[in-house]
């Protein structure tokens, strides 16, 4: 349950941390090619960043049905591992400046981790509500991931390096869930 909680904290609610990530993306110069040299508040850049966020939110909500179908057909272990690997690929794409597709994969796959861990509450008869609430809290804590990234970025790390590290972390979680922890 501790690993599932940590994994959920690292992925399931990240979409809600977008404002901090948008700050880092602006500093990194994402979509700055759409701006004039003398344009401090570039509307085209804002629109492009808002589009990435919108795509991410749509993927987060749109992925719920496919995740549910995967849980029914493949089981929790396979679903969680696949979605963690999908999110890791998304992080690598994000690191390669493919922001929309990367963010879509990260946020779309986040549901698999969150929903795929809920069944663990059944391991604690009489405490199912408490465990489910803990996982929902982990989902909310996921919004702090990009805030942490902004702090790391502010101390000198590049955004691509941060997202490559994030991809490695998610792949490590996939390995742990698939081979060690997650019951079928």
Regions found by a protein language model. Give the residues of each.
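Extracytoplasmic
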Residues: 2-39, 64
